[in-house]
Amino acid sequence: MLPCCEPLPLQTEKLELPSISQVHTRGPVDIPWYNHHAAERPLLSGDKLPALSLPTASQPPISGQSYRTSYEEASASHNASARTSLSGTAPVINEARSPPQSADLAAGGQGRLSLDSSAPQEFSIPQNTVGDSYYTNPTAIGSMNHTQPYMDVHSSHLSSAQPYASQAATAGGIAHYPQYHQQPPVLQPASTTYGPASSYQYAYPGGVTSSQPGPQPPTTSVSSQVPAQLLPLPVTSHTVAPAGYGNNTGTPMQGYVYDATGQVAPPGAKPRVTATLWEDEGSLCYQVEARGVCVARREDNHMINGTKLLNVAGMTRGRRDGILKSEKVRHVVKIGPMHLKGVWIPFERALEFANKEKITDLLYPLFVHNIGGLLYHPTNQTRTNMVVQESQQRRLEGPQATRASQGPQPPALHHHHSLQTPVPSHMSQPHAMTSQSAARPGLDRAHTFPTPPASASSLMGITNQGSSYEWGNQGMNSGVPNTQPLSIDTTLSNARSMPTTPATTPPGSNMQGMQAYQSQSGYDNSKSYYSAAPPSHPQYAPQQPLTQPMAPYGQTMPANTYIKNDMAPPTARTSGGPSDVEQADVKADRYAQTNGHVSNGAGEPVPEHEPEYVQHDSAGYNTNRGSYTYTTNPSVGSLAGDHSQLASDMSGSPSQQNGSGRMTPRTSGAPPQWASGYNTPPRSAAVSSLYNSVSETRGASANGTTDNYSVASNPAPGYSTGMNGPLGSGKRMREDDDVDQIVRPDSRGAEYESKRRKTLTEATVGGPVGGVPLGLQPMKAGGVMARRR
C-alpha cells in the first residue's frame, strides 16, 4: 500500500457521480446487489470505480498513498459524509471521478450498497474510511449511511479489488468501528475473505448492527445489514456471522434458513441448557437464557414459561399478559423461584409465539425435542443423566412421597444434594444422597442456572419439608455450611417442613446443622448463669429441665436446636403458644420454658395479665417469647437444644417456626434467641424469658407467678433484648418496662411493674451476645409494642 502522502486537494466541484448503470457495469454489480458471490470476484484493474464521495459532497479521487490522509482531512473538511478516501491497500484511480449522484445513491439504497459490499466488498465505503483510513475515521457513521448505497457504486468502480469492499461492508454495516476490527480480513484483496471473516468476526457483534436497524446480523456487515433481512445471502459469507448473531440478534442469518421448528441450531450457536429441579411440581426444568431472561421448560409435560418467553421478545407487560390470559391451556405459577413464576403454556403454543416474535433461534435449544441430550453436553453427560434419572424417579415417587416423611432419604433431597453437592458430606445424613452427591459433581443450583439460593431454597425447603428430618442437612444442601444452611432453609421450609418434622427430623443431624447457631451457644453460655440462677429459684430450677422443652427456644441459642426449633416451637409452646386457652399456662409455661421452668405453668399462677398478655400475641407471641426466652436462657436452650430442637420441630408450633425464620436472620448474630422471637413478629416474649434469666432473683422473689409475670413484663424488655441482644439489654428492657408499664396492659399492673423493676434492678448479667447496651432501651419499647401486637 502506498504510504499516505499529502492529501490531494479535494475537488468537489468537478466530480460527477456516474449513473448507477455505469456503476453497475461491473459484472458483479450487474448481479443482484445481494449476490455476494458475484461481488466476490476481485475487481479488475480495468474496472473503473466511481470516485468515492459522499452523496452530499463530491470528492476528487485520492491517490492510494494519500487515501488515509485525504480521508482524514476530507472527513475533517467535508465532515463524515465527505470522507470517501479509500485505504491505501487498494490503489485508487487518480483520475477524478464523479461520485454517483446523491439521488442515484439514494435510489441504490443502503440495502443495495450493503449487498454490493457484501459481494466483492471491494467497493470502498466513501463515507467510511476505507482501507487503512477506515479505522481512522469511524466518525463518518452518519455519513456512512448515506454513502452506503454509493459504497456499492464505489466498490464497483474501484480499479482493483480493494479492502474498500470490506469497508463498504463495514459501512453498510456501519460497522466502521467493528469494521476496523474486521478490517484486517477486509484488507485482504479478496473481498470474499473479508466479507465472511470480517463479517462474522466483528460485524455481527460490531457496528454492522448499528448500521442496520436492528437485529440484522452485523456480520457480513454490508451484505447482512441492508439486504440480510431482504434477501438471504449465501450462507458462505454469513456462516460464521449467523452463528454469532443468529443468536444475538434474534434475526435469521443471511445465509441461515430460519428454522420455525426450533430443532436446528442457528449457525455458530452453542446450545446452553441448564436444569433445575422444581420441587413444588416434582419436575425437572430445562432452562435456556436469551437476552438475559431465563426461559424454563418442564421435562414432564414440556410446558414452557410463556411469561418469560414473551419477555425475551421484549413485549410490553400489558400485551404479554393479554396474550397469556387468552390462552386456553395454561398453568399459572405464583409461588416459587422467580424464573419459574408466570403463565406456563403448552410447548406448541410457545413455539408459535416464538416464531411470531422471531425469537426461536434466540431460544435455541429450548424447543429441541431431546433437549435433555444437550444438558451439560457433552462433558457433564453423566451428571446430566443422573439429574434426569432422579427427576424421573421423583416423578414416579411423587412429590408427596418425597415430602411425606421420607426420612432422611427423600429423593428430593437426593436431588438437592446432587444439585448441591457441596452439602453432601456435611449432613451425615443417612441419605444415600450424600454418597450420591459426593459421587456426582455438584450441580449447585447456582451453577446450573441463574436462580438465587432463595428460590433454590424454596425448592430445597420443600425437599426438607419432604424430609424435614433433613432441615439442617438440607439447609446445608444449599451449599451453606450445615449450620447456616439450616438457618436458611429453616426460614423457607419451616412451614412446609413442619408437618414432616416430627417424623423425619434427626436430632443429630439437625444439631449438626445448627452448629453454626450453636456458636451462638456462646451467647447461651453467657446466659449460662441465668440458667444457673433459675435453678436457684424453684421456678428457674425447672427452667433447666424446661430447657429441653424450652430447648427449642433455648435451642435458638444452641444453634442446633435453635435452627430446628425455629422451625417449630417446642411442644409445650406449640400447644400453649398457639392456643389462647392455654395462655396462662402457656405463658407460665412459656415463661417456665423461657425461664427454664419445666412445668407448663410450673403451676405458677402466672399473673393473668401475663397470660392475657400472652393471649394478645399469646399463641404466636408467646412462642416468640419462648424464643426470646431462649435468648434469655440460652444456656438452658443449649442444654435442651438437641431434643428441644426435635421437640420444637415436632410441635411444629407456628410461632417457633416464625422464631426460626426470624432466628435465622438474627440468629446469625449472637442473639438467635431474639432472632427466633423475631421470626414471629419481634415480640418481647423472648425478652421476658431474658428478663427472667437476667433477673432470676426477681422471678424467684416475685414468686413463680411473679417471676413468670416478670417474664411477661420482661417480654417487652425481652423484645428489646431480642432487639438489643444481650440480657443486659433485657435488663434495660426491664427499665424500659417501667416506662413501658403505661403501654402494657393494665392487667400487668403494679405487680408486673414491680417485677419488672426487680428485673431492672438486677445487674445486667450479660445480654445476649452482641446484646444492645442500655442505650438500646428504646428497642425495648419497640418490643413492648410488638407484644401488644
Curated annotation (Swiss-Prot):
Origin species = Aspergillus flavus (strain ATCC 200026 / FGSC A1120 / IAM 13836 / NRRL 3357 / JCM 12722 / SRRC 167)
| Name of the protein described by the UniProt record | Cell pattern formation-associated protein stuA
Major place of residence = nucleus
Question: Which GO molecular function, any one, fits this protein according to its record?
Answer: sequence-specific DNA binding
DNA-binding interval(s) = 306-327
Expression triggers? Expression is down-regulated by resveratrol.
Region labeled Disordered — which residues? 50-131, 205-224, 389-459, 487-543, 616-789
Start and end residues of each HTH APSES-type domain: 272-378
